[in-house]
Amino acid sequence: MVLRELGRVRPAREHQAGRSRTTGPARGTGAARAEEEVLLHLNVGRIPVTFREEDGRLFGEMRQRDPEFGSIHDRKTVARLVGLRATDIASDLPIQTVSTGVAFAIVPVKSCQALSELQLDWKTVNSYLQGSSDAQFFYFVTRETKDPAARLHARMIFYNGEDPATGSAAGCAAAWMVRHGVAQPDERVLIEQGIEARRPSRIFVRAGMKGDRVTNVRVGGHAVEVLRGEVVL
């Protein structure tokens, strides 16, 4: 089933991917049923979303484009931009740009405490991202988590605030985890996000390997109807 084009517009700049909100609108169309696939038209292309029953709840999972791995960023430079010390950033994992449609620099931070202390100077951050960088946004992650079942604790802070759940970034993080050994190929892992924004979210991700390429990036979560209404245009 093909739905109408679905996108999301942010002030000043469009955040092109459908984020974790992709499964919600698909669920809300009434077309989403267990073991069914819905095809969404987003700005990054056609995104298939599949639904299945898990423990009596509807779980939606979208497949993103195969990832492109970009540049490695300097720890000291990034730390200075976001109000951290270079020692707050993990030295055993790279700060690397990954894109499945929107390019994120995945920034591995050592602890939840360091993540809570982020202070982005937007003038210099935008200058960096819009200058020589191949990333459009930063996605901050740490292997220290609040939930023992989670693999990463994440924050996505951008020019208009903080996003509690960023599916486009989580997909990039899934590819990054598989590429750098944080997750095994095809292992479904949990990313917790939105805790600092007091809107905790649970994003399930996985990615496969085909030869030396990361592929089959999947991002999902449980879709629950909380409101029903009509829009008159």
Label every PLM stretch briefly.
Residues 1-233:
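Active-site proximal loop and beta-alpha junction motif in alpha/beta enzyme cores
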